Amino acid sequence: QKKIPLYRRSFSNKHATGSVITGDVERTYETFMTHKDNVVLLKLHLIDLSYMLEEMFARLFAIFDNHRIHINLVHNTAVDIYIAVDSSWHIDDVVSELMATGLDVDKQENVEIITIRHYDDEIYRRYDLDENIIIKQVSPQSIRIVRNKIVN
């Protein structure tokens, strides 16, 4: 970045002093968190241990779409895919259809999704040590966690 300042002046008042816009301003962001409960986590595993390919993803998403089930999070590895969805009375029908496509399906109810934007080290450490975490997705700006619901 060249960090060239931008000088601004008013068109309506040509005698007024202008302002300078530079890239020296440090941006600060508030940390915020969202929480979603009443979520079901499905772990899909190909029985023949082949890799999840694009065609399989298309079939999976079509099944969820046909039952109008909202997908909240997708996490995949070479042979497994985890899909967190809203709880629905259609979920058992979806599980049956997924199994009919050659998938082994594990259904885990009573999970929650926590998304934290603009986290700091303290928040990261707090959630890094949580033994209830099933899935954790970390990027420089956010953390998404799927964990067993904690009942107080």
Language-model segments: residues:
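C-terminal catalytic "cap/lid" subdomain
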Residues: Q1-N152
